[in-house]
């Protein structure tokens, strides 16, 4: 019989082993769709971003007008821009759900896959931050000023580091130019890290909702999961296009329709919604360095997940106490997100502080204790 080119060609063989003949657990649910959705988000963002970059000018005097020009005068420029801006929101929705899935089902026990995933999250956050600065509106400028300024809290080298990052003594033209360069570069770094992430995942194979070894019951990725993924794509693109076409500015800040002005500070400086939980944690500590450390810890704590797993069972599927704790954590994150969008005044200050404390307590203390307790209750 003639050899199948899909299985013999050096390049097609890799595609085949990753997307066609890949053995996948037969019982993975829709929660396993978010990986492929993130891949599609990345491709969409790179494509729309490339088209936007063709019309963008990274100069403080022209940046704002160049974005306006794209929306007014470029064929479907408004659509490309709206898809790119709201695509970022969907990227974060997908990555947060993807991480939540990993946390619930104990996927973090694949340490290499999990760690590359956390690095991917950090890179995505950096990309979104530098990208938000590019339209050079008021919130772009002041957001960049506030967040880059946080590095000055680092003892001894802080101030030097900030001025080095700015390329001067304040956020100005050199800052915008380098942020554009970084915003162009980082998505390709994300693409590279994604391949590493997948390489590690395919070493072990996927986890599944039962959290048990599924080698005895695997099915080919194609057609079962290719079809399921396509359904996922459709279900994601529907709300994305609806948002981009009907209310493209719903998630944005009205302040960003005003060109950047270093002499006027907006009344409430706040990031996009997907950073609000971390922003609330940052603000809940009255000390600058303490806030910066808490901000870093809010994401870096994910690296500790594999070491804090004390339960004998992998997934939370059959662990009701851990489930309760997990959903309390989710509710807590919603509270942090809401507090981050509110002004710094009573009662939001104390709510933010309590929610921040709860966040770290659940992750670092209550999850391991509950896991150990469930072992006792189940006579492990």
UniProtKB/Swiss-Prot annotation:
Misc remark: Heme 1 (or BL or b562) is low-potential and absorbs at about 562 nm, and heme 2 (or BH or b566) is high-potential and absorbs at about 566 nm.
Function statement: Component of the ubiquinol-cytochrome c reductase complex (complex III or cytochrome b-c1 complex) that is part of the mitochondrial respiratory chain. The b-c1 complex mediates electron transfer from ubiquinol to cytochrome c. Contributes to the generation of a proton gradient across the mitochondrial membrane that is then used for ATP synthesis.
First and last residue of the signal peptide: none
Gene from which the chain derives: MT-CYB
GO MF annotation list: metal ion binding; ubiquinol-cytochrome-c reductase activity
GO terms (BP aspect): mitochondrial electron transport, ubiquinol to cytochrome c
Entry's transmembrane regions: 34-54, 78-99, 114-134, 179-199, 227-247, 289-309, 321-341, 348-368
Record InterPro entries: Cyt_b/b6_C, Cyt_b/b6_C_sf, Cyt_b/b6_N, Cytb/b6-like_sf, Cytochrome_b, Cytochrome_b_C_euk/bac, Cytochrome_b_N_euk/bac, Di-haem_cyt_TM
Name assigned to this protein: Cytochrome b
Membrane topology: Multi-pass membrane protein
